[in-house]
Swiss-Prot record:
Protein name per UniProt: Ribosomal RNA large subunit methyltransferase H
Catalytic activity: pseudouridine(1915) in 23S rRNA + S-adenosyl-L-methionine = N(3)-methylpseudouridine(1915) in 23S rRNA + S-adenosyl-L-homocysteine + H(+)
Chain sites annotated for binding S-adenosyl-L-methionine: 70, 102, 121-126
Annotated gene: rlmH
Location in the cell: Cytoplasm
Assembly notes: Homodimer.
Native species: Geotalea uraniireducens (strain Rf4)
Amino acid sequence: MKMRVLWVGKTQEEWVRRGIDEYAGRIRRYTPLELAEAKEEKGAAAEAMREREGERLVKLLPRNARLILLDERGEQLSSPDLAGFIAANRDGGVQELAFAIGGAYGFSDSFRSMAYKTIALSRMTFTHQMVRIFLLEQIYRGFTIINGEPYHH
């Protein structure tokens, strides 16, 4: 099973890029991973920004991918729960899981309607930059749990 992580906007901070590279490299030991960035919309009303960013995200989404949104209103999963979700999709024949991180104003209703599942990393608010690292670390942690490796305690 392939994995893809989509997000809106450029990664601004060098330390965030290093974290992304570190965890992406670790994940690629287990499965093919692609990272894709949609251009951030600026200078429009929030709903217009969500719509345009959603249209850009759709273009990065393969037809056969199962879409998982990250949103503060989503279901909170434990790390073992996320590992189980990844394993169940892999074992169930899903060809690709795609995780999407929205822009500053979240996702449009039309993009949200395409999601198979919506999850939250926390009820706290994080920068969209930091969420990239947090998500990749949790995906990596999930693979170590699936494989019975000692990373997760």
